[in-house]
Amino acid sequence: MRATVLGAGSWGTALASLLAGKGYTVTSWDKDAAVLDDIARNHRNERYLPGLHLPPTLHASAEVAKALEGAELVVLAVPSHAVRPVVIEAKRHVHAGTPIVCVAKGIELDTLMTMTEVVEDVLPVPLHPYLAVLSGPSFAKEVAKGLPTAVTVAARWERIAKQVQDAFHTKTFRPYTSGDVVGCEIGGCVKNVVAIAAGISDGMGFGANAMAALVTRGLAEITRLAVRKGANPLTLSGLAGLGDLVLTCSSDLSRNRTVGRGLAEGKTADAIQRELGQVAEGVRNARSARELAKRLGVEMPITEAIYRVLYEGLAPREAVTALMMRETKPEL
């Protein structure tokens, strides 16, 4: 099989390495020439996955047309804000029948579309049925190291979900299939916002009780938004919902949790992301998820609080107090 991965960041490179490790011929494309040169010459990506050796069947190209030539599988692994321009550039070189796997997590701010909705907005209609989402508790570094991981692959066509599942399945990477694309997308996007809240809680020393409350109530508001968008609530109890949320809220590998800890220390989100050197999607997603919730009439108090901390200068401790002092109500 020939596969193309658009985006050579940590997640794109980890998935490209996984596919190449199965013996597929894989080409990585990116805007960053230095990263592509490192992959092509040294079989490494020291910027995003330092110290890891990449398979020799993983190649690199700076030209979209060349990278997509003959591709039987396309993986879209760019940051959420880059999805639309990259798909616009790539669409002439993708053909009907080729599965397109979106692993970007976000809601486009201008349109409030999920990532698959953005892709469908750009691609010709005959390509829409071949679109799939891969999401779940999966840090790139651990996948690249071959540590056991389970994810969800969602597509409207069961055949496409199964095809993508088979393409990615290895002895250390286990995909489950689903038909709930929107549930997987909302779960994968909004958990990043809750993870910022988790980082703030940890950074301020609020303890295990607070963390358990955040994860539980965070899942509740993620589920409300997803269901309003048409998702199956059970999806949010699975890998793409609860699984991804628990991982992102609890691990030091989480960039969004790191942002929260930095905010608790008095740093700005911009300064924290500069230190990280990578995108923390929750910073953007706090704005877009809040706007989508307002449009759909969904109450999302944790998301609202994080938005106010990031964009209105609300002190993290005041945000916590505001959450705790909201009007009391039944849990369910």
UniProtKB/Swiss-Prot annotation:
* Top-level taxonomic group: Bacteria
Q: Where, in this chain's numbering, is sn-glycerol 3-phosphate bound?
A: K105, G136, S138, K191, D244, S254, R255, N256
Taking the record's annotation, the residue ranges forming a coiled coil are none
| Residues the record lists as binding NADPH | S10, W11, K31, K105, A140, R255, V279, E281
One GO term under biological process is:
glycerol-3-phosphate biosynthetic process
Q: Is Transmembrane helix given among the entry's keywords? A: no
Pathway this chain belongs to = Membrane lipid metabolism; glycerophospholipid metabolism
Give one GO term, molecular function aspect. glycerol-3-phosphate dehydrogenase [NAD(P)+] activity
User: Where located?
Assistant: Cytoplasm
Catalytic activities: sn-glycerol 3-phosphate + NAD(+) = dihydroxyacetone phosphate + NADH + H(+); sn-glycerol 3-phosphate + NADP(+) = dihydroxyacetone phosphate + NADPH + H(+)
Question: Where is the major localization of this protein?
Answer: cytoplasm
Do the record's keywords include ATP-binding? no
- Mind telling me which residue stretches traverse the membrane in this protein? none
Report the SUPFAM superfamilies cross-referenced here: 6-phosphogluconate dehydrogenase C-terminal domain-like (SSF48179), NAD(P)-binding Rossmann-fold domains (SSF51735)
InterPro entries assigned = 6-PGluconate_DH-like_C_sf, 6PGD_dom2, G3P_DH_NAD-dep, G3P_DH_NAD-dep_C, G3P_DH_NAD-dep_N, NAD(P)-bd_dom_sf
Active site as annotated: K191
Q: What is its EC number?
A: 1.1.1.94
**What is one term from the GO cellular component aspect held by the record?**
cytosol
UniProt keywords (A-Z) are: Cytoplasm, Lipid biosynthesis, Lipid metabolism, NAD, NADP, Nucleotide-binding, Oxidoreductase, Phospholipid biosynthesis, Phospholipid metabolism
Between which residues do disulfide bridges form?
Answer: none
| Biological function | Catalyzes the reduction of the glycolytic intermediate dihydroxyacetone phosphate (DHAP) to sn-glycerol 3-phosphate (G3P), the key precursor for phospholipid synthesis.
Family named by the database record: Belongs to the NAD-dependent glycerol-3-phosphate dehydrogenase family.
Q: What is this protein called?
A: Glycerol-3-phosphate dehydrogenase [NAD(P)+]
**Name of encoding gene:** gpsA
